UniProtKB/Swiss-Prot annotation:
The chain crosses the membrane at residues 109-129. Heme binds at H40, H64. GO terms for molecular function: heme binding; metal ion binding. Signal peptide: none annotated. InterPro entries: Cyt_B5-like_heme/steroid-bd, Cyt_B5-like_heme/steroid_sf, Cyt_B5_heme-BS, Cytochrome_b5. Keywords: Electron transport, Endoplasmic reticulum, Heme, Iron, Membrane, Metal-binding, Transmembrane, Transmembrane helix, Transport. Pfam families: Cyt-b5. Residues 5-81 form the Cytochrome b5 heme-binding domain. Belongs to the cytochrome b5 family. This is Cytochrome B5 isoform D.
Length: 140
């Protein structure tokens, strides 16, 4: 089913999302895979869930063979208007990680210092009280 290079919007492609009329978008190209649904090894439901969106990631995640990729040419009907496909949000790491990490390290240091000093002070106080009470024996 060779296409003539027509350009479709994502809205137009989304209208073809049933088992009787199924179009998908992979790598910026539109494919009418209706006739292939029954032959798909993973079943038709796998393809039907990828309609109405850019299915490139779904297609690549499965790890299709080069034969499967070559089969797509049979079903090509045109290209997608990339302006109509939503841009995927990219992860942007926080910029002020050093300030947070430094603050965490300083508070960790204070906690560890207190965990060491408080028992030491309690022990010192206990020995001091014991020593004081022994040396100050009651005078009779």
């Amino acid at each position: 089913m060779g296409g003539d290079g027509k350009v479709f919007t994502l809205s137009e492609v989304s209208q073809h999302s049933s088992a009787k009329d199924c179009w998908i978008v992979i790598d910026g190209k539109v494919y009418d895979v209706t006739k292939f649904l029954d032959d798909h090894p993973g079943g038709d439901e796998v393809i039907l869930t990828s309609t109405g969106k850019d299915a490139t990631d779904d297609f690549e995640d499965v790890g299709h063979s080069s034969t499967a990729k070559a089969m797509l040419d049979e079903y090509y009907v045109g290209d997608i208007d990339t302006a109509t496909v939503p841009v995927k949000a990219k992860f942007v790491p926080p910029t002020s990680t050093k300030a947070v990490a430094t603050q965490d390290k300083s508070s960790d240091f204070v906690i560890k210092l207190l965990q060491f000093l408080v028992p030491l002070l309690i022990l010192g106080l206990a020995f001091g009280i014991r020593y004081y009470t022994k040396t100050k024996a009651p005078s009779s």
